[in-house]
């Protein structure tokens, strides 16, 4: 039952940066003993609001009210002293220090300038026990997993008696087991009567944890859902993007050209049986399958990331000898990999460099001098045309959201003479609005005659975007479905292991 008096309230919060209005008149309430989710596209204002709550930013207008008292935080220490803790995606801990030292950093128990280590470890042990964690407080943090680091961050908040704890995309680097443990801890914190704010783009997490959901769009408050029995995925999407769920995919029938890509009995590591399929110019073919189906392995083999062990790849009827990615690129075949952070972007380089790095070789001056004029124009063109949200072309790409990183990778391949594009989980970890933009890029590529082969474990996405769906099961093709005829039941039936295989 919702309490009558909120513990935390935002009253008319606005925040303006030079030339940018990040938040406008944000007002809503949060109650003790509840998990209150914040949702919205990237740039909707969620993180800015958390930074105001934590004392990183001062609001331009409005106020934060905690337990009936209007607060004005001059810095993060003031917010901590008021019982506010933020658990960010990038954890703020010191690897070389012990677990206990991290938990009580800034308030180490001491006497005469000497730290009382026995008391420090005892108190830290109590906080860890509170969270159900069996960790030696004297262990250097660097020896712990990311999930354990997160528990240390939460223990640090509890050591400061935080009554308001906000989590910002907390599961992005966690294993399934660590996510389950985090959810257990959050539910315990809720039982203790704390206010939990939870920011995530993963709707399954939102529905699993939340008692209320507030949606932001373009820096403005849209709506707060308080009856979780009456809210569903479609209602949240519509609130976030201002469109019905059917409009997100935007598929329309199109005509195709000649065969552009063909696989003839291709095998690669992780692909159990020879794979044969074709994609025509202007056609979008979706590869769907469960974990272990072999989708990513097939694409890596096609692109030269691993070696094709049998069969032949053809582009425009011509056999292509692909032993490494440069061979695929030279033939006009590009790949946006599943793990964009590890295999797609160069994190410590600029957006400009990440867009230009592949096509740069074609535009050098005198065979050896970088053509800065071309690079600036090319990067700026793709930043505008793909709506890449960045302060500028020189911004490090690691500082961009996942959706904008993916658009920069697409900009890289749009700088090349593309015939075929392979997209492996192109919208994983991307918010709904950015997904819509990625889909529009895919449709635009198809309209230009590019053959699109994209793999996704998101079945509604495959059914909503692809002209034809190829279903893979345990390293082989289990069947094909046309867009107009396909439904989730058919696709899942094809993707599920055969009974005899499952028993064996």
Swiss-Prot record:
Q: Any coiled-coil ranges, and where?
A: none
Task: Cite the SUPFAM superfamilies for this sequence.
Answer: P-loop containing nucleoside triphosphate hydrolases (SSF52540)
**How does this chain sit within the bilayer?**
Peripheral membrane protein
Which EC class, in a word? translocase
Matching entries from Pfam families are given as:
ABC_tran (PF00005)
Q: Where is the signal peptide?
A: none
Q: Which GO terms describe its cellular component?
A: ATP-binding cassette (ABC) transporter complex, substrate-binding subunit-containing; cytosol; membrane; plasma membrane
Highest taxon of source: Bacteria
- Is Transferase included in the keywords of this UniProt record? no
Q: Which InterPro entries match?
A: AAA+_ATPase, ABC_carbohydrate_import_ATPase, ABC_transporter-like_ATP-bd, ABC_transporter-like_CS, P-loop_NTPase
Q: What is its main location?
A: membrane
Expression induction per the record is: Induced by arabinose. Transcription is dependent on the transcription factor AraC, the cAMP receptor protein (CRP) and cAMP.
Biological function: Part of the ABC transporter complex AraFGH involved in arabinose import. Responsible for energy coupling to the transport system.
Name listed for the protein in its UniProt record: Arabinose import ATP-binding protein AraG
């Amino acid at each position: 039952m919702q309490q009558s008096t909120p513990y935390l309230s935002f009253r008319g919060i606005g925040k303006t940066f030079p030339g940018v209005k990040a938040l406008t008149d944000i007002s809503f309430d949060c109650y003790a003993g509840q998990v209150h989710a914040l949702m919205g596209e990237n740039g909707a204002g969620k993180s800015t609001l958390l930074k105001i709550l934590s004392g990183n930013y001062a609001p331009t207008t409005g106020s934060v009210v905690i337990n009936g008292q209007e607060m004005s935080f001059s810095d993060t220490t003031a917010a901590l002293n008021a019982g506010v803790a933020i658990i960010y995606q990038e954890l703020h801990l010191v690897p070389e220090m012990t677990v206990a030292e991290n938990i009580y950093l800034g308030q180490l128990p001491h006497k005469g300038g000497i730290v009382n280590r026995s008391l420090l470890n005892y108190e830290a042990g109590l906080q860890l026990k509170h969270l159900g964690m069996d960790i030696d407080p004297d262990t250097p943090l660097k020896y712990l997993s990311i999930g354990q680091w997160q528990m240390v961050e939460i223990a640090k908040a509890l050591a400061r008696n935080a009554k308001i704890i906000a989590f910002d995309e907390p599961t992005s680097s966690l294993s399934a087991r660590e996510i389950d443990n985090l959810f257990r801890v959050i539910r315990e914190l809720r039982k203790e009567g704390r206010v939990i704010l939870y920011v995530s783009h993963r709707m399954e997490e939102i529905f699993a944890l939340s008692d209320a959901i507030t949606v932001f769009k373009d820096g403005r408050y849209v709506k707060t859902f308080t009856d979780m029995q009456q809210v569903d995925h479609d209602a949240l999407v519509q609130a976030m993007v201002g469109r019905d769920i059917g409009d997100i995919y935007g598929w329309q029938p199109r005509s195709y050209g000649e065969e552009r890509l063909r696989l003839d009995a291709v095998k690669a590591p992780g692909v159990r049986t020879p794979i044969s399929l074709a994609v025509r110019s202007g056609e979008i073919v979706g590869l769907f399958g469960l974990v272990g189906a072999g989708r990513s392995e097939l694409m890596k083999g096609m692109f030269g990331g691993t070696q094709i062990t049998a069969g032949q790849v053809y582009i425009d009827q011509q056999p292509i000898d692909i032993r490494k990615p440069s061979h695929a690129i030279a033939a006009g075949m590009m790949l946006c990999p599943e793990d964009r952070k590890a295999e797609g972007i160069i994190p410590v380089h600029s957006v400009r460099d990440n867009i230009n790095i592949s096509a740069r070789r074609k535009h050098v001056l005198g065979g050896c001098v970088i053509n800065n004029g071309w690079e600036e124009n090319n990067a700026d063109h793709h930043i505008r045309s793909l709506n890449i949200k960045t302060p500028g072309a020189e911004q490090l790409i690691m500082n961009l959201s996942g959706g904008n990183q993916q658009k920069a990778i697409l900009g890289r391949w749009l700088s090349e003479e593309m015939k075929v594009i392979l997209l492996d989980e192109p919208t994983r970890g991307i918010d709904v609005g950015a997904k819509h933009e990625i889909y529009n890029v895919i449709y635009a590529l198809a309209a230009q005659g590019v053959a699109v082969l994209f793999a996704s474990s998101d079945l509604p996405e495959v059914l909503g975007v692809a002209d034809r769906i190829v279903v893979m099961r345990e390293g082989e093709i289990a069947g094909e479905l046309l867009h107009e005829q396909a439904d989730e039941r058919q696709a899942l039936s094809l993707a599920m292991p055969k009974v005899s295989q499952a028993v064996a």
